[in-house]
Amino acid sequence: NALGCMILIIGISCGFIYFNRFNQIDNQRKLYSERYKKYNNIDKVHLIDQEIVFSQNDKKISVNSHIKIQNRNHQEVDKVMFYLNPSLQIEKLTRQGEDIPYKRDAQVIIVEHKLHPYESLELDITYNGSIDENICYLDITDEEYYDTQTGSSILRFGKRYAFVQDKFTLLTPECLWYPSTFPPVNPEAPYNIRKNFSNYTLKVIHPDDRTILSQGQPSQSGDTMIFRNKEQLPGISLAIGDYEKKSIVVDSVQIELYNFKGHDFYSEVFPNISDTLSGFLQDVKSEYELRKGRKYPYQKFIMAETPISYTGYVRNWKGNSEQTQPEMVFLPEFATTLPSSNFKFAKKRMANWGRRDPQGAMEEIDVEMNVIRDFVRRVLLSEETFQEEGNTFVNMFSGEWSGTSKLNKYDLSSMYFNYAGSIYSQNFPIIDIVMNTMLKQEESDQGRHFFRMFNGMGDDQRAA
């Protein structure tokens, strides 16, 4: 009948729309991967300095980037390449106020300009638009990219890799929100990537009172927040949101915690720690630095809340996720999905254990400190984390729990190693990740770590 035919047509149409959406994503990701491969063997120049002036209007950003680059190759280059998010449109590209011809091929910008060995060039690039998240994580498998499961949870939170919204903005180097001269990924040979440590200055024009977070020392000038970095960094990030701030200085490092307004679920759980928190964090910091054999390299450390849908991946060839950046770590709102984050339950469990101690029950302050210590150790100071698998309710009724050990997205060791320096060899491009993996090791089994690191490499990369 007519009603049945109409329902059938509607169902087929919905299925086609659903399929077409994923087909478009696949086509875009394939296009961007092909563009990386197309220009992979062309000599790249080094980014020396970059000053970024950023503003946002609704879901669009406007940026002016002043760039200084240098040809550090031993031969002349006849073109200069930049990488920029493909949804960001270039208004003008100039040198000393004069337009310079360029070509655009998806995320690749080709500037026809010769540079002799070690010759420098300064350019201004003005661009605006939105962020295409399909450019992110082209070096992971489709299975992992489209997998929306989070451990054993039956909930699906979705996956986002960048935000440009009225109330929240989050941009990391992965989404190419500013020009870079080296690609962030190499889909053809993932381990053959180079880091480019540069001097960054970020100026964010903001007419409202939202909190702005980035690397570097912040200062206010009128309606502009300025971040100046003393250290050279492989990239910078930007977060803008309605945050509440808590801070403390530990061993000359400014530690800052930012949660969304109304999301402070933890203060009431730990009412007794204010007087002892500084000493506790000092002990944790000293112990961790002793284990790693080096000091924390920055002057501040930021923990910032993000929407739960914000997603990243730990890739063996990078050694870290986008959730962990120089000076910054991005944590899911309300600590959802993080181990040991149910603080009230953890306090009850810790108190019950203490009551069984023949020496007597623990004091409330000791219970709170042990809960925080367990959370910090499992979330921030562990290279691996245990993730439950299957269905929570099925596991609960069957009494059978299974899981696997996975690399920890929030592991801070990358701040001490991966983001602190790099080694590059054209003949042995994997040397940087090998050295960082070796340096990170403590008393654990190095053979196991190296097996994990090389897992997934192609034969050509193993033979390189």
Model-derived segments and spans:
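N-terminal, polar/Ser/Thr-rich
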Residues: 1-61, 158, 162, 192-194
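Short structured motifs
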Residues: 47-54, 106-111, 183-189, 214-216
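Short acidic/proline- and small/hydrophobic-mixed sequence motifs that coincide with surface turns
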Residues: 61, 75-77
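Hydrophobic core residues within well-ordered beta-strands of beta-rich domains
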Residues: 61-65, 121, 198
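Asparagine-centered strand-capping/turn motif at beta-strand->loop junctions
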Residues: 68-74
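A surface-exposed beta-strand-loop module
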Residues: 77, 87-151, 188-192, 221-223, ...
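Extended, low-hydrophobicity, Ser/Thr/Pro/Gly-biased non-transmembrane segments
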Residues: 128-241
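Juxtacatalytic substrate-recognition/specificity segment
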Residues: 202, 226, 249-461
